[in-house]
């Protein structure tokens, strides 16, 4: 058994060293190791606009969700029950205090418990990022490294793709109502891809979803959404 574990570690190390950084998820033919390119290769960054939560001039995070290349969901109960945990908050606080603080600011639960929210997102979605399986790290793996890497990537993507900045630079400001195409065009002109918008039944903006393919293991490349979402006509952008 010890020999087998050592062999598996060596294989994982070789994979980590030989992955091509040019492979784009959902765009390759043949076989590519799922440590090198995500099995669920169309990834959705869902951002929330929830009055009372997060900074008044920032969208906050709902989650980063791996989907199939056709846009279907990954398994609803996650992809690896052995890595399910209800302690994401304590893990982050003890492992990376800076990340923990960023998440409290930009990834708050609108139901009151950040740890439960983050743990749900990890268990359902984070465990489905195949390139973050512990075996993909080889001998360099440190316990919880994949959790830190997942949440770091999500927060970094939120910072990099500044939806509020895209809207404000195009004159789309909270407290006003605009046509849905005004939102779509403003975000596309700034970020380079068409987003998906979600509204509640009253026509109030609640979420903006950005779609990505992944180049190599973790280089996210924005792409157009598969559909425009649930917003129609006049959309109200509430103040926080």
Residue ranges and their predicted role:
Residues 3-8, 40-45, 189, 208:
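Intrinsic-disorder/low-complexity peptide segments enriched for small residues
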Residues 16, 23, 32-33, 119, ...:
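Disulfide-stabilized extracellular ectodomain repeats and their linkers
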Residues 19-105:
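Betabetaalpha-Me/HNH-type nuclease active-site subdomain
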Residues 104-240:
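C-terminal, well-folded lobe of enzymatic/effector domains
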